[in-house]
């Protein structure tokens, strides 16, 4: 780690809590000093000394076209020339809304927000208003942003600091949140048998990306849909991470499930601050000004993010885009797995579309983790060694064993081969240790 980077971190710590503006950036889970970046292009990000790193974080998912995509940058520049924010409706919001509703059949109406957290928070308020019920169901290890009712046994950065439930969340608030095991169909049935008439909604990541990457069973999703329908509870898919990432139609298209509401994140604005929630017209009509559930935001649907999103969707909807992306992920993940197998390293992997997960399990008999408890049983020290080894070789992975990885369309065969070679070297060193 360079002295300059340590100086930057020390300077940041003076006025920024922990030196970062989002906890996972602090390297708390992996140790060491976070690297300060100052620019990015294509598949690479560059630190303040202009060292290049092949990036598999992609701003936590949205940089599916690669960093600084010319079409997106041009759209943002033109938008900025026309004014940054108006506080009025714009035609660009309608264009993005129309495009999302066209792509995702379950979304009949949609409301823009400024973040994924706002989207999930608003979707839950809407579900409560629509059903006139208070209780919500979430799953262990699923992260839905930092609103109070959702920071109960959450994944992502909460796990890195060893606090699965945030301090500062009143007990009276948390009592309305029921948390059950992920990928457990019987737990869903038991939950509805006990509280069915009180449950406003169930919210989940349809593929969990904040306890690494856990792909649940089809039975799990079928059971969720059946139970929510039978009990008149709203099914909310948090596709902030998976939407337009695991496929054009998101995880709901992969599983063939139509949720009642869906939440999206900054990918719809090509990485700029934006989110959205949408779904059935009957439910969405309860939002003000049509209904009595209030939600608002000065920068919701801001023109910079909307025009960036319009440019991005032109590429995402091109024929073969997601096939090409999946080929890149297959090449990378299969290469990692082959290298680990060669050196006797207990690696398990998951992948779908442009998203992947890596788990260092504790023995050769352990399968790919299927839930929160199994993920937490993985060997975090081995991951930390792997993370820093890759970082030293110019490969940037998420600085946490609880986060998924992301591929962009700009990652080249050379990038992928370089990454596999680096992993092979690290696994060889591990095998000798």
Curated annotation (Swiss-Prot):
The modification N6-(pyridoxal phosphate)lysine is found at residue 266. It catalyses: (S)-4-amino-5-oxopentanoate = 5-aminolevulinate. SUPFAM superfamilies: PLP-dependent transferases. Its EC number is 5.4.3.8. GO terms for cellular component: cytoplasm. InterPro entries: 4pyrrol_synth_GluAld_NH2Trfase, Aminotrans_3, Aminotrans_3_PPA_site, PyrdxlP-dep_Trfase, PyrdxlP-dep_Trfase_major, PyrdxlP-dep_Trfase_small. GO terms for molecular function: glutamate-1-semialdehyde 2,1-aminomutase activity; pyridoxal phosphate binding; transaminase activity. GO terms for biological process: protoporphyrinogen IX biosynthetic process. It is found in: Cytoplasm. Pfam families: Aminotran_3. Keywords: Cytoplasm, Isomerase, Porphyrin biosynthesis, Pyridoxal phosphate. The keyword Nucleotide-binding does not apply. It is an enzyme of class 5 (isomerase). Its cofactor is pyridoxal 5'-phosphate. Pathway: Porphyrin-containing compound metabolism; protoporphyrin-IX biosynthesis; 5-aminolevulinate from L-glutamyl-tRNA(Glu): step 2/2. This is Glutamate-1-semialdehyde 2,1-aminomutase. The gene is hemL.
